[in-house]
C-alpha cells in the first residue's frame, strides 16, 4: 500500500519532469527566434567581413597602439575567461540565468566580450531573451571568423564610454586629451570601468562612482594576477588624483 510519502515523491518527480519539459520547449522557441533574429543581421554585415569593415573606419585603434594595462584591465573586469571560451561562456551563462530567474529580471548579463561586440554591432540594447539567444549565435560566428586580438580590437573601438565618446580613441582624447598609446596606467584603469554603465560612472558627473568602479577593476586585476595588491593600491591613489575626477 502506497504511503503518503511515496505519493508525494511521485508527484515531485512528475513536477520536475514537467518543469524540464517546459524549459526545453521554451528554450527551443527562444533558440528559433534567436536564430531568425541573428540571420536577419547577416546580409547587411556578415561576420566574415566584420573585421575588414570595422578596421577600415577612421580612427580604428589596433592593439599595438593600446597600453597593455588597458587590455589587462578590460579582460579582467569584463571577461576574465576571454582567451579560453569560443564566444560563449557556459559558466557565466548559468550564473546569469540563475540570477535572472531568482530576481525575475534580466539584470545579470553573463555576456562575453564577443557577445557584447555582437550586441553593439547587430542588435539594440533592449533586453529580451530572444536577443540574448541571437547574441549567442552571432558570437559563435564571430569567433569562427576572427582572432581573439581582432575581436578585442573591434570591441574597444565600438563600445560607448559616455560623454559622447565611442571607442578607445575618442575616450582617450575626450577625457584626457591623449591618444590611446599615451594613456597612463591610472587612466587605463579608469577607462576600463566606464563601459559597464557610462552614464552612472561618468567621471564628469559622478566622480565618486567612477572612483569606486575603478576599485572594482583593480580588484579584478589582482584576482587575475595582473597586479599585486601593492600595485593596485598605488594605482588607486593615482586614479583619485586624476584631474578629470576633480572637474579640472
Where are these regions (language model features)?
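Juxtamembrane regions of bacterial inner-membrane/periplasmic proteins
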Residues: 1-248
Amino acid at each position: 500500500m502506497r504511503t503518503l510519502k511515496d505519493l508525494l515523491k511521485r508527484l515531485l518527480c512528475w513536477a520536475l519532469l514537467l518543469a524540464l519539459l517546459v524549459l526545453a520547449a521554451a528554450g527551443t522557441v527562444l533558440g528559433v527566434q534567436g536564430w531568425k533574429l541573428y540571420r536577419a543581421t547577416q546580409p547587411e554585415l556578415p561576420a566574415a567581413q566584420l573585421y575588414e569593415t570595422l578596421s577600415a573606419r577612421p580612427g580604428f585603434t589596433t592593439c599595438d597602439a593600446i597600453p597593455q594595462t588597458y587590455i589587462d584591465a578590460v579582460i579582467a573586469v569584463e571577461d576574465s575567461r576571454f582567451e579560453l571560451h569560443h564566444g560563449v561562456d557556459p559558466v557565466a551563462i548559468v550564473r546569469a540565468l540563475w540570477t535572472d530567474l531568482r530576481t525575475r529580471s534580466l539584470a545579470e548579463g553573463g555576456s562575453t566580450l564577443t557577445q557584447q561586440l555582437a550586441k553593439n554591432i547587430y542588435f539594440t540594447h533592449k533586453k529580451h531573451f530572444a536577443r540574448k539567444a541571437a547574441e549567442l549565435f552571432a558570437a559563435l560566428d564571430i569567433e569562427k571568423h576572427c582572432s581573439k586580438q581582432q575581436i578585442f580590437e573591434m570591441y574597444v573601438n565600438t563600445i560607448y564610454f559616455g560623454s559622447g565618446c565611442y571607442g578607445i580613441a575618442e575616450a582617450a582624447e575626450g577625457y584626457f586629451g591623449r591618444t590611446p598609446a599615451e594613456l597612463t596606467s591610472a587612466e587605463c584603469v579608469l577607462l576600463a570601468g566606464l563601459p559597464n554603465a557610462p552614464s552612472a560612472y561618468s567621471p564628469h558627473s559622478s566622480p565618486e562612482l567612477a572612483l569606486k568602479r575603478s576599485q572594482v577593476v583593480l580588484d579584478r586585476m589582482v584576482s587575475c594576477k595582473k597586479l599585486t595588491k601593492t600595485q593596485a593600491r598605488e594605482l588607486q591613489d593615482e586614479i583619485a588624483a586624476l584631474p578629470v575626477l576633480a572637474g579640472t
